[in-house]
Amino acid sequence: MSERNTLFSRPLPIALFILVALVADQAIKYLVEAFLPFQEAVPVVPMLALYRTYNYGVAFSMLSGMEGWFIVGMRLAVVAFVLWLWRRTPKDRFFAHLGYAMIIAGALGNLVDRLLFGYVIDYILFHTATWSFAVFNLADSFITVGAGAIILDELLQTKKTRSLKL
């Protein structure tokens, strides 16, 4: 039985997706830098504000005390590892391939910031009157949704494998 190629199992569609996602991420960050005040909440809807800040670490400002080149190297290693996973994953696993593309796009989006500025531009803030979530950006969202797509793919694959055994 041969594998059915999915859209993101082929190099050109995945490269185009990553490029479009990267351009969108950088364009939004450019607008954030140009028009949002620094560390001042701009309410959008209840519980959501735009809030420009800089992240010198990785997710949730972890490793913010580490040398910038260490973080750049770590991000490049993540991209290389995800590319390796993408190449080894069966071609019919749509959500896994979509997830890999999203993770690569997000990692590259934040890597561009790190290389250009020495920090990552964050600007999305979820909050209530007594609590607020970490400030993040579109690239972070790509990484999170991409990881979710891979988990979904694994769950679907497990269900498919179980039904084949019955």
UniProtKB/Swiss-Prot annotation:
Segments passing through the bilayer: 12-32, 66-86, 101-121, 132-152
One of the record's GO molecular function terms: aspartic-type endopeptidase activity
Listed GO biological process terms: proteolysis
Enzyme Commission no: 3.4.23.36
Its membrane topology: Multi-pass membrane protein
Catalytic activity from the UniProt record: Release of signal peptides from bacterial membrane prolipoproteins. Hydrolyzes -Xaa-Yaa-Zaa-|-(S,diacylglyceryl)Cys-, in which Xaa is hydrophobic (preferably Leu), and Yaa (Ala or Ser) and Zaa (Gly or Ala) have small, neutral side chains
Pathway involvement of the protein, from the record: Protein modification; lipoprotein biosynthesis (signal peptide cleavage)
Taxonomy, superkingdom: Bacteria
Coiled coil (residue ranges): none
Cross-referenced PROSITE patterns: SPASE_II
Residues annotated as catalytic: 122, 140
Class of enzymatic activity (EC top level): hydrolase
Family of this protein: Belongs to the peptidase A8 family.
HAMAP family: LspA
Protein name, per record: Lipoprotein signal peptidase
Source organism: Sinorhizobium fredii (strain NBRC 101917 / NGR234)
